Amino acid sequence: MSITQERKSALIAEHARGKTDTGSPEVQVAILTTRIANLTEHFKTHKKDNHSRRGLLKMVSQRRRLLDYVKNKDVARYQAIIEKLGLRR
């Protein structure tokens, strides 16, 4: 269910705003999106795993808050990250 360190490093490198950037909202949203996708696949076979479902809802809420923050700060960055990650917002 969790993502590997190599995958996380690749996401950071792909979405980082600078050379040493690891915590910008873009990076956080990308990591959360990958984790959400992994959990969604998990729920296709484990429909009654309500404990993990609560974690999924928490991640979705966190991603929504981060996207709202980026949207309020810079709409162009918001549009870019939505386009890059293929989110429907």
From Swiss-Prot:
Gene3D superfamilies: 6.10.250.3130, S15/NS1, RNA-binding. Residues 1-20 have a biased composition (Basic and acidic residues). Disulfide bonds: none annotated. CDD domains: Ribosomal_S15p_S13e. Keywords: Ribonucleoprotein, Ribosomal protein, RNA-binding, rRNA-binding. Transmembrane segments: none annotated. GO terms for molecular function: rRNA binding; structural constituent of ribosome. Signal peptide: none annotated. Residues 1-24 are annotated as: Disordered. The keyword rRNA-binding applies. Pfam families: Ribosomal_S15. GO terms for cellular component: cytosolic small ribosomal subunit. GO terms for biological process: translation. InterPro entries: Ribosomal_uS15, Ribosomal_uS15_bac-type, uS15_NS1_RNA-bd_sf. Part of the 30S ribosomal subunit. Forms a bridge to the 50S subunit in the 70S ribosome, contacting the 23S rRNA. One of the primary rRNA binding proteins, it binds directly to 16S rRNA where it helps nucleate assembly of the platform of the 30S subunit by binding and bridging several RNA helices of the 16S rRNA. Belongs to the universal ribosomal protein uS15 family. This is Small ribosomal subunit protein uS15. It comes from Maricaulis maris (strain MCS10) (Caulobacter maris).
